[in-house]
């Protein structure tokens, strides 16, 4: 899809990794960092993964790219508010200083789609999180929001180069 818009997509699983090596995870990490260093932008899939929030690896990648001053875009195929997803996963109740979960730990409640650090990283680049108006039929494979980010990246990158 990136090629249709004049971009070259870099996907972490494209890295060549020796799965028999003793340090496979470190090799994967180094390969991913190498790709991020090579990239001019990131389109982060912030769809909640194995819990109410984005994948921690993707959160790291977004922060890494932001720290390097590279264009940051993101999307989530789940447009619901973070605190609502936490509620679906378990108890959320009022605490002394805000909402807490069943263990009494604070639950972030800023009416955002995910953790404030992720959402506002995108805001810094004037690229708000892209979410679908209606939930997609296939949360994991629908590329509508991703394509919207690819279009936005193309416009921003080519406008910058012009």
Where are these regions (language model features)?
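Conserved catalytic or regulatory cores that recognize and/or transform ribose-phosphate-containing ligands
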Residues: 1-162
């Amino acid at each position: 899809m990136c090629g249709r818009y004049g971009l070259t997509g870099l996907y972490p699983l494209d890295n060549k990794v020796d799965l028999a090596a003793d340090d496979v995870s470190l090799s994967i990490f180094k390969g991913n960092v190498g790709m991020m260093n090579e990239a001019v932008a990131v389109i982060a899939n912030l769809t909640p993964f194995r819990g109410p929030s984005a994948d921690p690896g993707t959160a790291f990648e977004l922060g890494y790219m932001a720290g390097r001053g590279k264009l940051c875009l993101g999307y989530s195929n789940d447009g619901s508010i973070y605190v609502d997803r936490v509620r679906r996963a378990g108890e959320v109740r009022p605490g002394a200083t805000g909402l807490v979960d069943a263990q009494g730990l604070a639950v972030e409640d800023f009416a955002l789609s995910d953790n404030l650090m992720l959402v506002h990283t995108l805001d810094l680049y004037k690229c708000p999180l892209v979410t679908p108006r209606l939930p997609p039929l296939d949360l994991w494979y629908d590329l509508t929001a991703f394509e919207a980010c690819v279009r936005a990246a193309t416009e921003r990158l080519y406008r910058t180069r012009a």
